[in-house]
Design a protein with these regions (language model features):
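Cytoplasmic-side transmembrane-helix entry/capping segments in multi-pass membrane proteins
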Residues: 77-88, 103-110, 129-138
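Hydrophobic core segments of alpha-helical transmembrane domains in multi-pass membrane proteins
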Residues: 56-65, 103-113, 158-169
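Hydrophobic alpha-helical transmembrane segments in multi-pass integral membrane proteins
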Residues: 93-105, 143-159
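C-terminal ends of transmembrane helices
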Residues: 64-75, 116-126, 174-175, 179
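Short, highly charged, low-complexity non-transmembrane loops/tails of multi-pass membrane proteins
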Residues: 178-196
Length: 196
């Protein structure tokens, strides 16, 4: 769905100004990511509001997205599957129990998992220099520490929840789960007929 919109928009931009724009595939990739993020964020805002936890939902989402950028992770091939999966995972994590001891445990587990497993990139993804990845990993660890400080000062647990979600997805079990989900979402349908 998003891919079709991205292709259509990239086609229009290339028709308007073919000389001064990025290559078509770069435009499609960028627009697909943009549409995916907007859809996911809008969906989470709406559902968070409906279930009565809009601020908590935004906290979890922002923390998850920041760490995802810093630490990578397994990916789904279809952007709509990515949006739906991300939304379901975030909405599951807003229901985690809250207490000072539990939040400290979530924080410690997140810190340990990110220190151990980050970064993760799929084989087809571009890997940056080791120095750059170490800087991103340090930034991720600082972010996790910052999430606990936010919880401690402002009683906002969602940032810790988002960190835990991303940390769990970096584990071998989390990566295996996403890969199995990707295989499931790719079976049958128009998309697989075109690519297979």
């Amino acid at each position: 769905m998003f891919e079709k919109w991205a292709v259509a928009l990239a086609d229009q931009i290339k028709k308007i100004n073919p000389e001064e724009t990025e290559p078509h595939d770069v435009l499609v990739f960028g627009f697909t990511i943009l549409f995916n993020l907007l859809f996911t964020f809008l969906l989470l805002l709406i559902v968070g509001w409906i279930i009565g936890v809009p601020l908590l939902t935004v906290e979890v989402t922002l923390s998850f997205m920041i760490l995802r950028i810093l630490t990578g992770g397994a990916h789904l091939d279809r952007s709509i599957a990515c949006s739906i999966t991300s939304s379901l995972l975030v909405l599951t994590f807003v229901w985690l129990p809250v207490s000072p001891i539990l939040l400290f445990c979530y924080f410690v587990v997140s810190l340990m998992l990110i220190a151990r497993f980050a970064p993760y990139y799929e084989p087809h993804q571009i890997k940056h220099s080791k120095q750059w990845e170490q800087k991103k990993k340090r930034a991720a660890i600082l972010w996790v520490i910052f999430t606990f400080v936010i919880y401690y000062i402002f009683s906002a647990p969602g940032f810790v929840f988002g960190a835990l979600l991303q940390a769990l997805l970096l584990t071998p079990a989390g990566i295996k789960f996403i890969h199995k989900l990707n295989n499931f979402t790719m079976k049958g349908g128009e998309y697989c007929e075109k690519s297979g």
